[in-house]
Amino acid sequence: MRCPFCGNIDTQVKDSRPAEDHVSIRRRRFCPACGGRFTTYERVQLRDLVVIKSSGKREDFDRTKLERSIRIAMQKRPIEPERIDQMISGIVRRLESLGDTDIPSKVIGEIVMESLARIDTVAYVRFASVYKNFQAADDFDKFVSELRPTAPAEE
């Protein structure tokens, strides 16, 4: 593993243990060249997923990009980081289990929205505002009004 401080490719693993999510391994590494210490995480990847964008462009699935967008939606929400990590791992497992390596971005967005809706409504609305490309306050109003349960009709 290349040292992020000096670029040396000969680093040593000093400690290795399961991460808190139990789907990855946390490794503490040491660089003998510069003395730097850093942490890496190793995860199982069942298959290489390819995202098909709405424009038709294809790009490799990037877990980090997915994680970043979810963490932005969850920012300053009272959700434990471990819960977010579990949700992200669950989304990735679900994508890998779809049986196809080519996944439309729309499918990924819908799965993320389903997961967020179960955990935090505010994060769900935040993510939806970007995913559905809200342009005005009316877009928010319409979306939020669809979330509210309707009162039963009076007879």
Swiss-Prot record:
Cofactor(s) recorded in Swiss-Prot or TrEMBL: Zn(2+)
InterPro entries: ATP-cone_dom (IPR005144), NrdR-like_N (IPR055173), RNR_NrdR-like (IPR003796)
GO molecular function: ATP binding; DNA binding; zinc ion binding
Record keywords: ATP-binding, DNA-binding, Metal-binding, Nucleotide-binding, Repressor, Transcription, Transcription regulation, Zinc, Zinc-finger
Cofactor binding description: Binds 1 zinc ion.
ZnF (unnamed) residues: 3-34
Record carries keyword Signal: no
GO biological process, one term: negative regulation of DNA-templated transcription
ATP-cone domain: residues covered: 49-139
NCBIfam families listed in its UniProt record: transcriptional regulator NrdR
Family designation: Belongs to the NrdR family.
Functional note: Negatively regulates transcription of bacterial ribonucleotide reductase nrd genes and operons by binding to NrdR-boxes.
Protein name: Transcriptional repressor NrdR
